[in-house]
């Protein structure tokens, strides 16, 4: 009996020893490579999110909103009138309607070739859909956001896209500026495009070149409306109470992945408040500008992201920008201004602008949100906490012909809002890069 007890005791000791070793290994595996702050996050149930190559539904929905055109125009057939969208909402509805045939065009596009302004105008004069995205949208990323596999030919970016029917074939035209036009044949369903275009009723819109305006831009869309909304600009933090400031700051911190209750905080000159968590720094300036820094190792090497990674980075940036700004932009909406890789800095930069009623808002900084990625990591970001409100109707816009006659040049000429402090002026301006 004593021998049996001894054997059982030995077995129990071995089991306890193995259990202790297993628990030690589990704890070591769990904490390996994790800082003290990271362990505290885990203890409080706040797990850091790993960089995802394939964005989730929420990120994709934000990115899709960002690449919705600011305006669209549709012509049913040669000689027919033009249908134009009156704001971003109607442009979104038109874009959604044309989405399937556009996605098919992006998926089946052949190698692009240069086109002339005469070919561009011919395309606009026949059965077609015209889209102005407001910024330079990478076509491959646009295709992926629309659920399509982009053609290998779709490597560039475009602000203006036209899908036209020529000799029974759907042909894609696109341009990122006022000069370079590219054209490619596609296998998109031309008959379906014709049927969709026929559903739109002309509502008085015209392209400027149709009005015989001298040196008119081929992309300048003239509206029959005689007024545009008056818009005012307000800095979010200028009039916020202490409790509002704390709430806004909490939203911003959580938007950037900080634990709002744990970072180290100190003040700099000029009323700037600085939040530090590990290597990451967030500065909230008194005027409402937000600057985020997450320095990467100097020994790391950047690289040009492929189309999948570009789409993922755009989606990640869109989720961040919309998540922070959507509660404060007021009557304005974000749009993708640019998403491009800089070979010199080895950074992939995503910029968002603001529009109101489908009209771009120009300002000193051009972008209200900027995200810069090094490799797969968000390294720096800039957010402008600003609100735009419609306050009435502006009926003092001069005719386009007069504005064109007075313009120093036509590249970038269009109807914009220009933010100047608290005042936002609507008028004909030349957009500067």
Regions found by a protein language model. Name each.
Residues 1-7:
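N-terminal Lys/Arg-rich, disordered targeting/topogenic segments
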Residues 15-312:
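Preferential activation on post-signal-peptide N-terminal prodomains/segments
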Residues 20-24, 314-321, 368-370:
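Short low-polarity hydrophobic stretches
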């Amino acid at each position: 009996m004593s021998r049996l007890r001894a054997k059982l005791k030995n077995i129990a000791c071995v089991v306890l020893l193995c259990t202790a070793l297993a628990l030690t290994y589990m704890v070591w595996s769990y904490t390996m490579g994790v800082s003290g702050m990271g362990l505290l996050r885990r203890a409080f149930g706040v797990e850091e999110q790993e960089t995802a190559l394939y964005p989730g539904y929420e990120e994709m929905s934000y990115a899709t909103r960002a690449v919705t055109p600011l305006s669209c125009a549709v012509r049913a057939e040669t000689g027919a009138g033009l249908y134009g969208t009156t704001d971003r909402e109607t442009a979104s509805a038109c874009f959604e309607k044309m989405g399937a045939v556009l996605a098919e065009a992006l998926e089946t596009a052949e190698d692009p070739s240069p086109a002339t302004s005469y070919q561009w105008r011919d395309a606009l004069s026949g059965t077609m859909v015209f889209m102005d995205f407001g910024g330079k949208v990478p076509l491959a990323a646009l295709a992926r956001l629309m659920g399509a596999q982009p053609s290998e030919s779709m490597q560039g970016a475009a602000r203006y896209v036209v899908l036209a029917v020529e000799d029974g074939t759907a042909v894609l035209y696109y341009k990122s500026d006022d000069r370079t036009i590219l054209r490619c044949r596609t296998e998109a369903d031309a008959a379906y495009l014709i049927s969709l275009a026929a559903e739109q009723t002309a509502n008085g819109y015209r392209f400027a070149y149709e009005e015989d305006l001298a040196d008119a831009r081929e992309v300048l869309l003239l509206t029959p409306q005689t007024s545009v909304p008056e818009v005012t600009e307000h800095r979010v933090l200028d009039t916020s109470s202490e409790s509002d400031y704390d709430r806004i700051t909490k939203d911003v911190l959580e938007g950037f992945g900080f634990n709002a209750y744990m970072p180290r905080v100190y003040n700099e000159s000029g009323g700037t408040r600085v939040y530090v968590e590990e290597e990451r720094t967030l500065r909230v300036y008194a005027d409402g500008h937000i600057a985020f820094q997450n320095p990467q190792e100097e020994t790391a090497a950047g690289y040009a992201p492929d189309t999948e990674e570009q789409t993922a980075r755009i989606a990640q940036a869109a989720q961040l920008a919309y998540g922070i700004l959507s509660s404060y932009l007021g009557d304005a909406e974000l749009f993708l201004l640019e998403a491009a890789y800089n070979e010199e800095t080895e950074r992939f930069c995503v910029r968002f602008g603001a529009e109101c009623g489908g009209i771009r808002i120009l300002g000193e900084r051009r972008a209200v949100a900027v995200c810069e990625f090094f490799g797969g990591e968000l390294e720096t970001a800039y957010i402008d906490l600003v609100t735009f409100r419609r306050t009435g109707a502006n009926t003092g816009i001069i005719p386009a012909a007069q504005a064109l006659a007075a313009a120093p040049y036509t590249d970038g000429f269009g109807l914009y809002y220009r933010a100047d402090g608290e005042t936002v002026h609507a008028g004909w301006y030349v957009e500067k890069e």
